[in-house]
Amino acid sequence: MGDNMHFLPADLSCTSLEEELLTYEHYSESEKSFFICEGVLMYLQPEEIETLFSFIRNHSGAHSSFVFTFMELDNDQICFRNSSALVEKWLSLRSEVFTWGIPRQEVRDFLASVGFDLVQIATDETLRARYIATANPEGLPLAQGECICVAEINVSQIERNRLL
């Protein structure tokens, strides 16, 4: 790992990104940063998600990236499409109830509303075609309904915010 790469784990159910990051000695708000938020947004409320995006947008350098996973909202349901009732029950018993999802076709507009640009969305089909198909032609089962999104801060949004 390079000297400029640091891993800062944070349990957002116990602390805020702001509390963790702004007191971290290696973080600079003016530098381009790369944020990863895997398996988190589906458990947050919409207001918490907007706060997270707002913080990243307002406290990181131009062209910073945010990679996150999200659950696809499908027929008003937030769930893994290929999971059994047993999986749903197991998640429920563990108090892992999904509270936020979004239809894939609405992600670009959502990101624009919070000051980000969509770079790429990877679905189970994308991952299979890109990484698994040649290594496992029999077809390793993948979770359907959770996607990976790569977003970048909209630079004009940063400039507008700094002028206010």
Locate each region found by the language model.
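Alpha-helical subdomain
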Residues: M1-L164
